[in-house]
Amino acid sequence: IFLILFFFLFLLVGLSLYAQQNCFISSYVRGNFYNRGRISAESLRASDDLIFLNVRPNKDGSLSFENPRIFENGKGVTSWEELIKSVRADVKGTKTKLRLGAASGEWKAMVADEAARVAFAKNIKKILEKNKLDGIDLDFEWAETEKEYEDYSLAILKMREVLGDKYVFSVSLHPVCYKISKEAIAAVDFISYQCYGPSPVRFPMEKYCSDIQMALAYG
């Protein structure tokens, strides 16, 4: 009996450790929430991956950054560069990765132009190098046509080509927008899927599960 109990205890511990090793928690960090004290240091330290959602692409591939007006009061952080430094101090001693997040802006026009895609990827790499960040997350909402999916996929491939394997590269997709090319899927380290829920009011369990399976079936 002792041997049986020991075996099941060993199995339980092993499964628990496996689950912990294969669980990866990413969190977006916005300067306005941080300055208002709405993000605790404990929450930051509990994350494996923190994404500073601070940059927007312009149509030519240049970058625009979060409006300085949001950095007011609170912790005294006055720019997104200071936000990175402050959060880096908050998570000192952990293995938390710090990454840049790109969203919104003129992304559809940018990904539609080959020269702009190249410029965007190179500009992102410069920011990562300058601020000693661990990678980039793209949260472009949303591609709506076959051409937009194709252009977005090409931008993803170009980003990986420019960054190489040194940086962590992810994209955030959604149940209404997930059909990037198989080559683009293979080019990223992982994909976050904005499948919210389950919630009995807006996102019932059946819808939550079907949305997940839909993306998995796609590949």
Where in the sequence are the language-model features?
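Bacterial N-terminal signal peptides
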Residues: 4-14
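Loop/turn elements at helix/coil->beta-strand transitions in domains of secreted/extracellular proteins
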Residues: 20-25, 45-49, 91-97, 131-136, ...
